[in-house]
Amino acid sequence: YLPRNQLESKYANEIHCKEIAILPYYIANLNIEYTYKQKTGKYKEFENICLVDTLDNVGFSKNYDNQMDIFWLSDENAERIDKQNSKKISVIIGNPPYNANQLNENENNKNRTYPAIDDRIKETYIKQSTAQKTKLYDMYARFLRWSSDRISENGIIAFVSNNSFIEARSYDGFRKVVADEFSDIYIV
């Protein structure tokens, strides 16, 4: 519950959104703006949504080199990315894309590399693992690693995820690292 008199400040300064695909970007933006209008009775543009690949945007500074060369990566979007990167984040909620183990090249859903995140996975989850190492470069592990590195102290991470990390041998290092990095873990 958030009192109405605090909503404007939260909306303008504390709620942020990232999306890599253009249609979900617009849908998220519309949903956020519509909810704000429903709660307050007035429309206000939501200025804290960015069109960006979260996993390419590491180091929390300008890094657009690996972003797709697309017409909508405007100066305004770049400014929004910089603004988000400078913010202290205490809650991250996400639904990482799933594209591990595609059946063939024609699925057009390749697992691309993310050097900065993949290095962090190697330094943490893989370093602590006794299992096959390549499975830890899936999108779930990447987003969890990014979130763990990005979150502020006393922060919360909530993801929609499969359950492979609970018992799979390939996630033994992940489980060790997460147990060390977090004081509480809830799996629903």
What is the predicted role of each segment?
Residues Y1-I187:
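SAM-dependent methyltransferase catalytic region
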